[in-house]
Amino acid sequence: MPSIHPQHLDTVKQTYHHKFAPEDEIFSHIHRGDRIFISTACGEPQYALRALMKYVETHPKAFAEAEVMHIWTLGVAPYADEKYTYNFRHNSFFVGDNTRDSVNRGIADYTPVFLSQIPSLINHKRIPIDVALIQTSLPDKNGFVSLGISVDICRAAIDNATIIIAQINENMPRVHGDTFINIDAIDFMIHHDEPLLEYAPQIPGQIALQIGNYVSKIINDGDTIQLGYGSTPNAILSNVSEKHDLGVHTELLTDSMVELIRRGVINNSKKNINKGKTIASFCMGTAHTYQFIDDNPAVEFRGIDYTNDPRIICTIENMTAINSALQIDLTGQATAESIGRQFYSGIGGSADFMRGSVLAPGGKTILVIQSTARDGDVSRIVPFLDSGAGVTLNRGDVHYVVTEYGIAYIHGKNIRERAMSLIGIAHPKFRLQLIEEAKQLNLIYRDQAFIPGKEGEYPEYIETVRTTRKGQVVLFRPVKIDDEPLIKDLFYDMSDKSLQRRFMSFRKDVPHEMRQEFVVIDYTKEMVILATVQEHGKEVVVGMAQAIKDVNTHTAEVAFAVRDSYQDKGIGTELISYLTILAQKEGLQGFTADVLVENKPMLHLFEKMGFEIEKKVEAGAYELKMRFR
């Protein structure tokens, strides 16, 4: 991506010959105890770094205990090697694969801090920078180079460094935004063209793809999104290709995001700030992506104190932050940075984006996590975080938690409710254990029932969306183990008359012990179908159908309830119609039901379904036997 003619570069070298000094002379300006900043991730100046290490090997006493600082390195990190402890001390704001061992052995450092705060710490000299070792594009005709794919904290580092050493590389794209530096501000330049580091995350597996499918159901047309690192975010993006008018305000720009920009899925047209612009702070991808962002005015890179500032994020309408975690407990605390006492990654930008998005108008926060680790041997959903684990996200930071087993909405829920919701999306083989541990810790009811094994696994395939004759769009789905609060709201919102018709007797309450019978079921023997709608962004149960199989007669005993405010809107008709379809698929031949004589609407509903009906009156109620035609 050359931005100038080679002859002009020769002119620059002649004009600024003192800046293109021999490498040994350049590195001789580094002194003992200096703090050296290195560009982030794929923006790492590989040749310049190799040259620095060569200088240290030939001049082993040139300087001592220089502190090497960066967010994250993807390239080699020789300065973290134990043999260079005299010369370097590595200090990272994020722990990567090639520095994790050194950090946990105590021969390298990790500084836990919100990424949005690092530029301020640098600007106020709380984190002083003596030398900035960066990589840039070639200078343009006006004498400016671009930081290209790594702006993040690099901008603050060069604004405050005593010495700036830049490797200029024709392969570094010129990216719009806060990326430009005049060569007058650079102390030394090393011209070396080489391919930029590339980042290719693992191809998403089946688990990641299933998580991505669930997350896509939460993302709406017009949302502005932020995603973290790894194969799961890529799986999420592969599932949103049918969305429209998405925006991006993120820390990290990836290949998958760029592909959606190419397709027009991401166009930033609905953003209320930076409209029409994809905003990011750095990029990790392939050369194909680097070419796309080169001199592309639709993409702007800003300092991480802008992209990650919760005060800015909270002003973005429909901001949706999607980040991953290593472990989450039943109270909603999550760690994305450590496995127990072992440092694994870092705070990163997830806390910045999650907290900003919680406050944004229409904002959402989504935490994605695979249900197990260590090849399925341990659950990532636990009663409480492991001892020593850093709490990256607290109990108020997360709206949705998504595993390959479903979606748990925990925002605004009490500890008991969120514990049950999270158990419901844990790996099935760990659910009984989590139930028992949660009981012992008084997180849930002491008498909480549970059905282990296949019999208790949620049959998601039964979910369907239908529109009633009155135009009401309704989700029909099986009951879940965490639906007790929704069932309680349904029953207690019903009139005494409706309750009497449902339970065939007069009653004022439907206590917890009774409600459990509706939500903890053996799906192979009975079915409870809920009819739900969204009211003010909240799922509300407006109707319920229950069917209990009789294997001897090949029928099912059924009962129905519809919230009073939704009666006469076709909810009951759709419930019985769908329950009939499910029963026929199971090979059942009909229904039985008890209906109070006074319950004319229910009787009429059965009659209009076209069943062959036998009626018998007993103690003020019809005993109905209904055969499918």
Predicted feature residues:
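Conserved alpha/beta enzyme-core scaffold
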Residues: M1-P452
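Long, contiguous binding/interaction regions
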Residues: E457-R629
